[in-house]
Regions:
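Substrate-binding clefts and substrate-entry loops adjacent to catalytic sites
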Residues: 2-12, 48-55, 63-109
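An acidic, Gly/Ser/Thr/Pro-rich helix-cap/linker signature
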Residues: 1-33
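Solvent-exposed, polar/charged alpha-helical surfaces in well-ordered, non-transmembrane soluble domains
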Residues: 16, 23, 27, 39, ...
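Acidic-enriched, low-complexity/disordered segments with a strong bias for Aspartate over Glutamate
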Residues: 19, 36-37, 78-81
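Glycine-rich active-site/cofactor-binding loop and its immediate structural neighborhood
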Residues: 38, 62-63
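Short, functionally critical alpha-helical segments immediately adjacent to catalytic or ligand/cofactor-binding
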Residues: 34-51, 108-111
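Short, mixed-charge, low-aromatic patches
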Residues: 20-26, 46-54
Length: 111
């Protein structure tokens, strides 16, 4: 019973966070030609926790490592960390996805 209660409360929290964050990132994804379903990567990466930080040092909703964040245009230093800025980090994520699409040739799996 305790596991069900935990799962229910976590699900409710994710729904609340999705209602807060998805309306911000959906237009950014669309403007950059990124499939709307990619927003769910944020759920997997950070549980939609804007202050998430992994033991390895990845941070923010999209869980960028410092060097990767800088590579895709985010300012990351001792004074500023734009990995926590939802709009800027989402634009950086779009750049990351576009680079991956260029390397792979498509967002779709083609055996």
């Amino acid at each position: 019973m305790m596991a069900f209660t935990y799962m229910h409360s976590t699900t409710m929290l994710l729904i609340k966070r999705a209602n807060r964050y998805f309306p911000i990132i959906e237009p950014i994804l669309k403007a950059n030609g990124i499939p709307d379903d990619f927003k769910y990567l944020m759920v997997i990466e950070s549980n939609l926790n804007n202050i998430a930080r992994s033991p390895a040092g990845a941070a923010g909703l999209w869980q960028f490592m410092p060097a990767t964040g800088r590579e895709f245009g985010l300012e990351v230093n001792d004074n500023v960390d734009e990995r926590y800025h939802i709009e800027k980090a989402t634009v950086a994520a779009c750049k990351y996805f576009k680079q991956a699409e260029h390397v792979a040739g498509s967002f779709l799996y083609q055996p």
